[in-house]
């Protein structure tokens, strides 16, 4: 384990994002390509939250002290050849999650490696200055938009993702960690059948998935670009989940990123917010009607004129929800994933890597709008964007790790 200090904090005022005096201050933690996902937790239990991206923890409250909780990867070849190349390659840290998995009071780190690789658990050594123990807990974690959420309702989060292989085929489901021994092998519980169609649909690079209570029965359901899977009354038999087809990607797109489930219009029914193509264009929300069907409401399209504010950008590869302006309504954040497929691989790969939050506004007539608020035009998102209160002021902040570097966007006090 190595400790080091950042010579100076690099602070810049992000481009004004003013809605009810919401303005963000940008802190550059590093310009190195470390990861495309990150997590936030108080790893050292000093009362201040920390940021982890790649193999490094930046310690709060000023994030100038660094700890390597595990040695850097040494990959002589492959898509994640080291040092990680932002223009041509990827990293071994696609997404990252923090949770006290072993119940000892110290947050651990779950690393979702490249899709199709093992999911890794790094166990916190309870403040000791030594490398964290590393455990491969799930042999093949597929999909590009997994999540960590308590699906079973037992208070312990599961990793919802996909998995594939000769024996399993392509299946959607969730990996359950062993409560008695979280560092042991997790058990995958598929919710879809094995079919030739699913073998092609659910594989390492499948895009677009999320989790939330779609039908209001108090149980967590799973959504994909093709519809949603209803959690049954009981999970005891390990059976398949009923599927409700919905085209959440109009026009047959490849699918987006994290799909958000919350009540947009205030009618008491859960709606869905999603990007349409993680490597192209499109963003929208889908209103759930009283009969359970969904109606599309486009937010962004392929042209600036598709949005009232003229906003248009590509590669919306990460979304996260939060009430940024404190009005009691759920907003969300997304942006452009810089060089998702390199410098020439996707539409407009070299356009400004923007980061936006979308303010939810409800009208008295029942109308709804998501107003885009530009936070920054030199960062964007990775395959994950993390929302957390990094300075304990009660306001949601934003943390990003991607091919541009690692950033914190901290809300400034009003006025």
What function would you assign to each model-found segment?
Residues 18-415:
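Beta-propeller-forming repeat regions
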Residues 4-16:
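Bacterial N-terminal signal peptides
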């Amino acid at each position: 384990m190595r400790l080091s200090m950042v010579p100076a904090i690099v602070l810049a005022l992000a481009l004004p994002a003013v809605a009810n005096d919401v303005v963000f201050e940008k802190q550059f933690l590093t310009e190195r390509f470390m990861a495309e996902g990150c997590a936030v937790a108080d790893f050292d239990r000093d009362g201040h939250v920390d940021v982890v991206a790649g193999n490094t923890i930046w310690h709060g409250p000023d994030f100038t002290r660094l700890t390597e909780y595990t040695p850097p990867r040494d990959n002589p070849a492959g898509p994640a050849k080291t040092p990680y190349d932002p223009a041509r390659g990827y990293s071994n840290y696609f997404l990252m999650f923090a949770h006290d998995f072993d119940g000892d009071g110290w947050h651990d780190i779950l690393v979702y490696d490249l899709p199709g690789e093992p999911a890794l658990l790094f166990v916190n050594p309870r403040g000791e200055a030594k490398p964290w123990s590393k455990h491969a807990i799930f042999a093949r974690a597929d999909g590009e938009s997994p999540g960590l959420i308590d699906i079973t309702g037992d208070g312990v989060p599961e990793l919802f993702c996909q998995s594939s292989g000769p024996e399993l085929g392509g299946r959607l489901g969730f990996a359950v960690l062993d409560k008695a021994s979280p560092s042991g092998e997790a058990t995958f519980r598929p919710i879809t059948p094995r079919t030739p169609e699913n073998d092609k649909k659910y594989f390492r690079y499948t895009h677009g998935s999320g989790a939330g209570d779609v039908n209001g029965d108090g149980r967590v359901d799973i959504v994909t670009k093709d519809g949603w899977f209803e959690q049954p009354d009981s999970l005891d038999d390990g059976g398949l989940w009923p599927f409700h087809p919905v085209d959440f990607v109009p026009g047959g797109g490849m699918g987006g990123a994290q799909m958000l489930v919350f009540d947009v219009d205030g009618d008491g029914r859960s709606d869905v917010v999603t990007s349409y193509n993680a490597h192209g264009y499109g963003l929208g929300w889908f209103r759930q009607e009283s009969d359970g069907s969904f109606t599309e409401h486009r937010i962004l399209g392929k042209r600036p004129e598709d949005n009232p504010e003229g906003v248009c950008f590509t590669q919306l590869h990460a979304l996260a929800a939060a009430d940024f302006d404190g009005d009691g309504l759920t907003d969300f954040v997304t942006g452009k994933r810089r060089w998702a497929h390199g410098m020439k691989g996707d539409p407009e790969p070299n356009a400004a890597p923007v980061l936006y939050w979308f303010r939810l506004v409800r009208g008295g007539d029942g109308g709804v709008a998501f107003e885009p608020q530009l936070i920054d035009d030199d960062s964007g998102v990775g395959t994950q964007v993390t929302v957390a209160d990094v300075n304990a002021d009660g306001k949601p902040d934003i943390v990003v790790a991607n091919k541009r570097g690692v950033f914190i966007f901290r809300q400034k006090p009003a006025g």
